[in-house]
């Protein structure tokens, strides 16, 4: 059997590029449920969103108690090419549970999105909350969200974020964020790091944001998180 020798770096790069493109073409499959969270089958990500089928997500809010008085949430800035909520500030880490996965398996998202290794035992479970979001005529998002909190004093530079999914990371003071949600203030100033796509480097960033700059979540969703944080203090 003859094994073809790889001639140089250019050929290696081409092999890696092809491999990455092939991995992107893999169809994601989700377990799907009825409104009572009883499993009814399996379907593709595309069909799940097109048909508005209930599915599960893993969501983790990272809380830093050293950045500002009262603590701060870590938010990710969604990449402009995301199919849902491009360019908006979102949960620290979140992802769909694949077919056959259990909730604890979702902890892999922290490694994939933020480059940190965390065990499920290091997270605090807030609970499950069901939410429906009609994003467009093509996307009806019905999710059973399993929500966790991870307390970490990492700096922004300690995270190796997934640059094809995330454009930046920001700390947002929890008290100010709560006032923004309650309509007591219109804007807040946040600081973080953002990917400069021209220079392909991470640079500091400061921006003034309002409620519409964040992905939408219900009042009940945020109460679930804030109540759990209060119980931990």
Q: Where are the language model's segments positioned?
A:
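A short coil-to-beta-strand element that immediately follows conserved catalytic motifs
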Residues: 117-127
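A positional/architectural concept
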Residues: 28-62
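Alpha-helical and coiled-coil interaction segments, frequently adjacent to or embedded
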Residues: 2-17, 21-23, 28, 196
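Conserved Nudix-box catalytic region and its N-terminal flanking loop in Nudix hydrolases
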Residues: 19-21, 47-59, 68-113
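Short, well-ordered beta-strand micro-motif
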Residues: 62-64, 77, 149-151
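Residues that flank catalytic or metal-binding motifs in active/ligand-binding sites
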Residues: 26-28, 56-58, 93, 125, ...
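Nudix hydrolase/Nudix homology domain
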Residues: 3-8, 127-135, 139-233
